[in-house]
Amino acid sequence: MAGIIFDDMFSVKSVDPDGKKFDRVSRYFCDAESFKMELIIDINSQIYPLKQNDKFRLVLATTLREDGLADEGEYDPKAEYPRIKQYEYVMYGKVYRLEDDDSGTDGGQLAAYASFGGLLMRLKGEAINLHGFEVDMNLYLLMKKTDF
């Protein structure tokens, strides 16, 4: 689908390992199944609770439009996006930092940091899997729990 810059299945390895900081937010540490990526993400656990060993699909996209065109830049309550209906949890945010491991080797590690209204995400793995990320780009996060 157009506009998707990352798509993989993740498994929750731990929940709030450093203790719970906020009443309605949990920090999840997850591992990807296909691309060997590490994900740390804050999620409103009151709206979308996850527990250890839960599996979910994570999609990161630059637009919700199926045709891949950029969004209008303002909220339209009449707009219908079929992409949203396929997922259970959706957030909108911005990439605020990209960080490499400075090892100087080909295919090194890269970490992309994004904020979704203060809920933070770090996605880390091989740089080739994060080539579509840029600092200050707008980003949609879409999640759906899976059974397998």
Swiss-Prot record:
Region of interest (Non-specific ssDNA binding), residue spans: 16-40
Question: Where is it mostly found?
Answer: nucleus
What GO biological process terms does the UniProt entry carry, in alphabetical order? DNA-templated transcription
Q: Where in the cell is it found?
A: Nucleus
Provide GO CC annotations from the record.
Answer: RNA polymerase I complex; RNA polymerase II, core complex; RNA polymerase III complex
Superkingdom of source: Eukaryota
A Pfam family that this protein carries is RNA_pol_Rpb8
Q: Does the keyword Transcription apply?
A: yes
Keywords associated with the record: DNA-binding, DNA-directed RNA polymerase, Nucleus, Transcription
Q: Name one GO molecular function term.
A: DNA binding
- Keyword Secreted in the entry? The reply is no
Q: What is the protein's known function?
A: DNA-dependent RNA polymerase catalyzes the transcription of DNA into RNA using the four ribonucleoside triphosphates as substrates. Common component of RNA polymerases I, II and III which synthesize ribosomal RNA precursors, mRNA precursors and many functional non-coding RNAs, and small RNAs, such as 5S rRNA and tRNAs, respectively.
What family does this belong to? Answer: Belongs to the eukaryotic RPB8 RNA polymerase subunit family.
- Subunit structure, briefly? Component of the RNA polymerase I (Pol I), RNA polymerase II (Pol II) and RNA polymerase III (Pol III) complexes consisting of at least 13, 12 and 17 subunits, respectively. Directly interacts with POLR2A.
What this protein is called in its record is Probable DNA-directed RNA polymerases I, II, and III subunit RPABC3
Taxon lineage: Eukaryota, Metazoa, Ecdysozoa, Nematoda, Chromadorea
